[in-house]
């Protein structure tokens, strides 16, 4: 791919995201989603590997179907109510169609099948965009229409996402697939609280974005595409690997790390809403995800590959330090004491 094309595509992604999150009209929001889809496809397929082309094709087909559903939902609502305003989604059929469309775009269960496959075929930094930035516009649409959505349907999808995200990640050896199922599991936590506290759902997404970005950037630094490559990277970048372990534990939601904050606040809010069984179920299902995070963390630091003693520790490293990775990793680990302030601001 032409090197000058990448900045144009990244700017297009920023433009599409900005249009969607700042619009009040359904057609403008749909336009932003389409710009995003068309801008990310060349980034997915830029390696020209058959798997990358396959991933780009799968992504295009699913996103095109979801965008058509968004448009159909808004047209049905406009036909019934005469309103094109995003916040005026009052028609029950339109609400159901929109929930399905956004679930496809986000990769929520039962529309999650495309997401791990697309992530597996993408480069690590494109996978980072797919897991974080590309989820922001559809999530914004859900937040803007949260008062019209069906809480029972979203709770069922959320619990299914937390369950399948945990179960399907258990036997994975590819880091991108592990992070794809991690994303599905986290989306379950966001979806379950969306109707009751949209601000808390947004806070959860922000913290998930920070932690996932730190993991992807660390994996990109050590060029680790599977568990065995993570295993052999300890001798070259010990500090980065130790940091990666802490960020993974934060992503799992262990105290006293940042990732514990959203889980704690969501369980508290669900209990206030008299949804204690749902809170208990999603808390138990997060133990499934904890297992594969622990396995990845164990591979990244504790278990060393068998090799000769003179190769165990290298005093030099060819990898220069990365400031964004350091900042994101620090935020992923140290934000829990600031929970009251962050919750008050958001």
Curated annotation (Swiss-Prot):
GO molecular function: NADH dehydrogenase (ubiquinone) activity
Primary residence: mitochondrion
Catalyses which reaction(s): a ubiquinone + NADH + 5 H(+)(in) = a ubiquinol + NAD(+) + 4 H(+)(out)
Pfam families: NADH_dehy_S2_C, Proton_antipo_M
GO-annotated cellular components: mitochondrial inner membrane
UniProt KW keywords: Electron transport, Membrane, Mitochondrion, Mitochondrion inner membrane, NAD, Respiratory chain, Translocase, Transmembrane, Transmembrane helix, Transport, Ubiquinone
EC number: 7.1.1.2
Topology of the protein relative to the lipid bilayer: Multi-pass membrane protein
Annotated GO biological process: mitochondrial electron transport, NADH to ubiquinone
Subcellular locations according to the entry: Mitochondrion inner membrane
Keyword match Mitochondrion: yes
InterPro entries (alphabetical): Complex_I_Subunit_2 (IPR050175), NADH_DH_su2_C (IPR010933), NADH_UbQ_OxRdtase_chain2 (IPR003917), ND/Mrp_TM (IPR001750)
Transmembrane segments: 1-21, 25-45, 60-80, 95-115, 124-144, 149-169, 178-195, 200-219, 242-262, 274-294, 326-346
PANTHER family for the chain: NADH-UBIQUINONE OXIDOREDUCTASE CHAIN 2
Role summary: Core subunit of the mitochondrial membrane respiratory chain NADH dehydrogenase (Complex I) that is believed to belong to the minimal assembly required for catalysis. Complex I functions in the transfer of electrons from NADH to the respiratory chain. The immediate electron acceptor for the enzyme is believed to be ubiquinone.
Family that this chain belongs to: Belongs to the complex I subunit 2 family.
Name of the protein this chain belongs to: NADH-ubiquinone oxidoreductase chain 2
Organism, scientific name: Anas acuta (Northern pintail)
Gene name as annotated: MT-ND2
